[in-house]
Amino acid sequence: MKNVKTLIAAAILSSMSFASFAAVEVQSTPEGQQKVGTISANAGTNLGSLEEQLAQKADEMGAKSFRITSVTGPNTLHGTAVIYK
């Protein structure tokens, strides 16, 4: 039982510290950061879901921030974003 509690506490703490390093969505080019690439993602009809997928891809690429540059599609949304480091 003690191991289960320790495991749960470790999982919660690791997710909290990981979130502090997550890429941040920005509205313009961040000062002191450079464009390092672009990413794209497809989602359902929910804009929030598309934003989450783009944020996850930005994190995987090691970006500090990302800026969504386009969103298209009436049924399945497709979005692109510029990533910065």
Swiss-Prot record:
What Gene Ontology terms for biological process does this UniProt record contain? response to copper ion; response to stress; single-species biofilm formation
Key word Membrane present: yes
Q: What happens when the gene is disrupted?
A: Disruption of this gene increases copper sensitivity, induces stress response genes in biofilms, increases aggregation and cell surface hydrophobicity, and decreases indole synthesis.
The record's Pfam families line, in alphabetical order, gives: YdgH_BhsA-like
Keywords associated with the record: Cell outer membrane, Copper, Membrane, Signal, Stress response
Superkingdom of the organism of origin: Bacteria
GO CC entries: cell outer membrane
Per the record, the similarity remark reads: Belongs to the BhsA/McbA family.
> What is this protein for, i.e. what is its function?
Reduces the permeability of the outer membrane to copper. Seems to be involved in the regulation of biofilm formation. May decrease biofilm formation by repressing cell-cell interaction and cell surface interaction.
Protein name as catalogued: Multiple stress resistance protein BhsA
Originating organism: Escherichia coli (strain K12)
Q: Which gene encodes it?
A: bhsA
